Amino acid sequence: MSFQHCILGIVASAAAFGLSPASVQAGSFSISPLRADLSASAQTGALTLRNQEAAPVVVQAQAMLWEQADGQEQLTPTRDVLVNPAVFTLPANGSQLVRVALRRPADAQRELTYRLILTEVPQPASPDFTGLNVALRLSLPVFVAPSAAKAEPRLEWTADRTADGTLAITARNAGNAHARVINFSVAPAAGSAAAIPQDVTAYVLPGQARTWTLDKKHNETTSGTDWNQLRV
């Protein structure tokens, strides 16, 4: 059964369109900000890493082209973005400024998307160490605004019934900039059943789509004919 006629209107926080926390702490690091926003007039950006531990840490930084295809993330090494320094030692209880710089022109009509990958370089363990040495790896978005158009995401929502009877909700980004979906709710257009909330937290890059399948426990709830139209 197809559910193409949807009453649109995402029920989500403002973060659905790209807002994110200013900083995050992961393992022994804290990082601020959590993304870099570049443009034709602001071709460089900077992030600050802070070491919360009493021992130095070696970190490698690399820029990757960020694409999506069939709902899957694709990262490819790129020279479009310069990262400096590319390898550095983060002092004990110290900090390091990492700069990113655009090395190509911004696209006139569409946002460019990259990822800054920060990887901890594992150090040799002491002879008496018996634990698991886990290297930290973080991925931060780098966005480049179009030079001749306003950056605007535009999500188009559809719903379809899968072969096993579950509802699959798809958000297709018809805009020229990324959207960040935090959560959404699905309900029948007639309002005869309670809305089903979904927490997802995912980026939808321009021209791409993401699909979420509702848990099978909702099959019975969503099987009625009043779900021929949905509000998402």
Label the predicted regions.
Residues 9-20:
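Bacterial N-terminal signal peptides
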Residues 26-52, 150-166, 201:
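Beta-sheet-dominated interaction scaffolds and their linkers
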Residues 53-75, 174-192:
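Short acidic, flexible loop segments centered on an aromatic residue
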Residues 73-106, 193-220:
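Intrinsically disordered, low-complexity Pro/Gly/Ser/Thr-rich segments with frequent PxxP/GP/PP motifs
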